[in-house]
Design a protein with these regions (language model features):
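Acidic donor-binding/catalytic loop of UDP-sugar-dependent glycosyltransferases
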Residues: 47, 120-133
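N-proximal low-complexity "stem/linker" segments adjacent to membrane-targeting elements
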Residues: 1-29
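A conserved acidic beta->alpha catalytic loop
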Residues: 41-61
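Short, acidic, metal-binding catalytic loop of nucleotide-sugar glycosyltransferases
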Residues: 25-34, 54-60
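Long helical/loop segments within the catalytic core of UDP-sugar-dependent glycosyltransferases
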Residues: 65, 69-70, 77-84, 96-100, ...
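The conserved acidic donor/metal-binding loop of glycosyltransferases
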Residues: 42, 101, 117-121
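Short aromatic/hydrophobic "clamp" motif used to bind/position activated sugar donors
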Residues: 113
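Short beta-strand/loop segment that forms part of the nucleotide-sugar
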Residues: 34-43, 65-69
């Protein structure tokens, strides 16, 4: 696989009008530019779709989606190429997160896709790092990223301006537990090809394999 080959980053979302823009701003700061962002709105009852359309001057389009895996049908599709990162919004009938994930997989236009939660933000080199294993070995079918909770984190335009341990003891313990799990356990298990799970908050997958396995 060549470095120039693009990937799809997609986010299933439901009632996240207040937070999606932070994720988009962090995607704009990525040093890797060969990707598109796809948002699947799973029938939100708030203004999730409306805010995205207005914030990024999106236009309604017609685009056939071949549903190789089952999911609820789309209601409308919007797209913009005016921003640094191409953005597509698919609004669909509510079917739950798994159904929204299926729609995202069906709509991906590239061989690899990255799943990201709506409340995630990325470091500037995150996409470069998570795609490195598939660039070095085309047999790699899934890659997991390191996740840390954003407790007591200051964000500015989708960027972590200040990171510190929370003052709340329970929140602090959560940060320590995440670090222990991702920076110790998972890295250790990976040395023995023993990783059992890829986090849904930030994981990369090979599209044709996922469709074949019907996961």
């Amino acid at each position: 696989m060549q470095y120039q080959e693009k990937i799809t980053v997609f986010t299933p979302t439901y009632n996240r009008a207040y937070i999606l823009e932070n994720l988009y701003r962090s995607l704009q700061r990525q040093t890797c530019k060969e990707f598109e962002w796809l948002v699947v709105d799973d029938g939100s009852k708030d203004t999730t779709s409306q805010k995205l359309v207005e914030a990024f001057d999106m236009k309604a389009i017609r685009r056939p989606i071949h549903r190789k895996i089952p999911c609820q049908p789309e209601e409308f599709i919007y797209e913009t190429a005016a921003e640094k990162v191409p953005l597509t919004l698919i609004r669909k009938k509510n079917g739950g997160k798994a159904d929204a994930l299926n729609m995202g997989i069906n709509a991906c236009r590239f061989p690899y896709f990255i799943c990201m939660d709506a409340d995630s933000v990325l470091q500037a080199d995150s996409l470069i790092k998570i795609t490195a294993p598939i660039l070095s070995d085309e047999n790699t079918i899934a890659v997991g990223g390191v996740i840390r909770p954003c407790n007591d984190v200051e964000l500015e335009n989708g960027w972590v301006k200040r990171y510190r341990l929370p003052k709340n003891p329970l929140a602090c313990m959560q940060v320590i537990e995440y670090d222990r799990y991702f920076l110790a356990s998972r890295i250790l298990f990976d040395q023995f090809n023993g990783s059992l799970i890829i986090s849904g908050a930030f994981g990369l997958f090979k599209k044709d394999v996922i469709i074949t396995l019907n996961l």
